[in-house]
Curated annotation (Swiss-Prot):
UniProt key word Mitochondrion: no
Pfam annotation, one family: Hfq
Underlying gene: hfq
Protein name: RNA-binding protein Hfq
InterPro entries with a match to the protein in the record: Hfq (IPR005001), LSM_dom_sf (IPR010920), Sm (IPR047575)
GO BP terms: regulation of DNA-templated transcription; regulation of RNA stability; regulation of translation, ncRNA-mediated
PROSITE patterns documented for this protein: SM
Quaternary structure, from the entry: Homohexamer.
């Protein structure tokens, strides 16, 4: 995972998991509203009366309708990253 996504993914996941309504502003000024159904590295699937696949490169701002408790998600994500790094170092040391 890219370093720049270490905040983005847990934040979007918290919005998705808690089904928080969001307003997504595109770089051209268009405002989209709905709930985040899913997302990946390149797109967000926004659900309202219809599903819209929104490319992340077209997004300027994501505004949740209420505050997001993403702190625990971010903290968990960093713990998992640390554990993965420790496992890699341990594996490297065992092969030496």
């Amino acid at each position: 995972m890219a370093k720049g996504q270490s905040l983005q993914d847990p934040y979007l996941n918290a919005l998705r998991r808690e089904r928080i309504p969001v307003s997504i502003y595109l770089v051209n000024g268009i405002k989209l509203q709905g709930q985040i159904e899913s997302f990946d590295q390149f797109v967000i699937l926004l659900k309202n009366t219809v599903n819209q696949m929104v490319y992340k490169h077209a997004i300027s701002t994501v505004v949740p309708a209420r505050s997001v408790s993403h702190h625990n998600s971010v903290q968990h994500h960093h713990i998992v990253q640390t554990q993965e790094m420790q496992a890699e170092v341990l594996a490297e040391n065992q092969t030496e």
